[in-house]
Amino acid sequence: MKKRKIAAAVTSAVLLAVLSSVMSSVSRSLDDQNMAERWKGGELDYAQVSVFYPQSKSPYKETDAENLRNTITEKLKEGAFRPENEGAEIWKDAYSSVISVSSVFRYDESSGKTEPAGSDYSVAGVGGGFFEFHPLRLINGNYIYESELDNHRAVLDRQAAWDMFSSFEITGMKFILNGVEFEVAGVADPGDNRDIKKAYPPAPMIYIHYSALEEAGLDTSLLCYEAVIPDPVTNYARNIVLENFGINTMTENETDEDPEKKLDVVIVQNTDRYSVPKLWKGLSEFRTMAVSDRSIAYPYWENAARMTSVTMEILFLSALAAALLLFVLCVSEICRLYLNRKWHLKDFLEDMMYKYTYKKRTSDYITSPTDTGEKSRYDQ
């Protein structure tokens, strides 16, 4: 029985260590959720906050992203935040929208004609530092940037590149989307993460400038806004975003989701979404996690993050079980050792009383160095 307990304890300890290592690895596996870590360059802490907008009759537009951007800028000015390096940015943001299109035409420079290049594409209009938040792996070429003058450049994912041109070496080639000509800036791949692969749209993806959506006659409804903001105290960054929507009730001790329930948007603090308190909260709400009261079509990176959350919660529950088993085994072994002890508290106390009371009393009768006082113990 003793050997079995030792084996079970060792197994539990090893399992707990392995699960902790796996959880640490999984929590860092999504680059889309770790922008704050990449952005932080000094002692100042940062938090990544995302806003997901509903698809309603009165949708949010690019102007709403600009308003939120202005709110954050003003709040950081009020807080007197300054970049550690002169000329550097103190914070960063990005916004995006995803639309489906039925067809795209490829431009053949040799003949000067256009021809169909497949159908059913997903088009992502992106603004700000989108590819800093979502660093897709480049296969060829470069990303597109908000600061560039030409907004008719695009990044294709590998499936879109192959469907259009049957090649990945296509930088500089052109295609036509809803009558507007675009030039290929680069080809990118979403990566090998399992959850990203499952959540990624089945239709080939084209990334274009957000400002080009309206020119191409596409829906400009805002889907997602993201920002990495200084977070010197808990909930500071999130509170700034909430204030933009008229809510200013966040404190360090308040439940994160309570103020959000008053809004038609969903606000997520990506930075600590896999922390122990959030995982514990996720387990307590596991039954209701599939229930949604908002008409929001999440982008693939958020769906992947939510799938990863489920994985993390299962790993966390397994780690709790291993830790509990190890604790029970250790406590039971301590109890066994105590019950089988060869010493008793009563004997210990009697010895201490004899040492510090009787010897103290008899020391008054000691008359020489060789006299220990033992004789006086029997003197009448």
Model regions and ranges:
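N-terminal membrane-entry
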Residues: 303-325
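Membrane-proximal extracellular/periplasmic loop immediately following the first transmembrane helix
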Residues: 25-102
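Extracytoplasmic
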Residues: 44-46, 118, 148-151, 170, ...
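Mid-to-C-terminal secondary-structure elements
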Residues: 129-138, 156-244, 250-300
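The feature marks short, hydrophobic/small-residue-biased sequence motifs that occur predominantly
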Residues: 92-144, 148
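Hydrophobic secretory-pathway targeting helix
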Residues: 1-37
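Juxtamembrane interface at the cytosolic side of transmembrane helices
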Residues: 322-373
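Solvent-exposed, non-transmembrane alpha-helical starts
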Residues: 58-67, 116-120, 150-152, 192-204, ...
